């Protein structure tokens, strides 16, 4: 088991360099760094909010790794995994290898995306000024911006 200092000096330094050069998206793995946190990186507020957003000043989108992977079972049942990933700081959660679960999970999920997440995802879709698109959608009364993003 590596210490947090070792992880920061070796692994995080690469990400910090990429962030400084304009990295616009990351995908945390389901790897557990037990010296730093009890949760795997993709379910960890420590890694996504503290280390990535605050310490490394990452402004891009965070996409979860596939929630149907065996490594994700540490997050619990499927709905619990998705909620944990969103609460940890993921902007979008991927469910790639179990498409039959998507509708079921969406019906169970009660989640409102933050305006920051929406802006990051709009940026990934090519919007140069996502805050304007978000403001316009709110003014036009779009209730579910998540659905709007997914269909753009």
Regions found by a protein language model. Give the residues of each.
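Charge-patterned, long linear interaction tracts outside catalytic cores
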Residues: 143-152
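Second-shell residues forming the walls of enzyme active-site clefts
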Residues: 1-136
